[in-house]
């Protein structure tokens, strides 16, 4: 939302924008101590809470299909395990030269959805 906007989500967009800016700022400030700072951004993630929310909507299967149709990679929600795998990568030595980054673990939702809409 901080990168794309969607309407009626000003507070959420502001919080996401702050996360993005602070990630970059803290990466610069903590660089001299050898501390890397990165953030993870997710879109729709299938969790028990999300499942409960969607199951309390009228036509839950239809709503889930509508949401998942907007996720370009495999038309499905991200799993908690996929997010955890991304975090494990950022915490590992495999990302030893990565700092100040916002990593989107969202099946291409933020950066590909709008581009593919016209394809």
Question: What do the predicted segments below correspond to?
Answer:
Residues 39, 61-94, 98, 105-107:
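C-terminal helical subdomain
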Residues 1-18, 23-32, 44-45:
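Catalytic loop of short-chain dehydrogenase/reductase
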Residues 4, 88, 99-119:
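Short C-terminal tail/terminal secondary-structure segment
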Residues 31, 36, 98-100:
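Short, small/polar-rich loop/turn modules that mediate ligand/substrate recognition or access, typified
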Residues 25, 52-56, 101:
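Residue-level signal for well-ordered alpha-helical positions
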Residues 32, 45-71, 114-119:
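A glycine/serine/threonine-rich, flexible loop-to-helix segment
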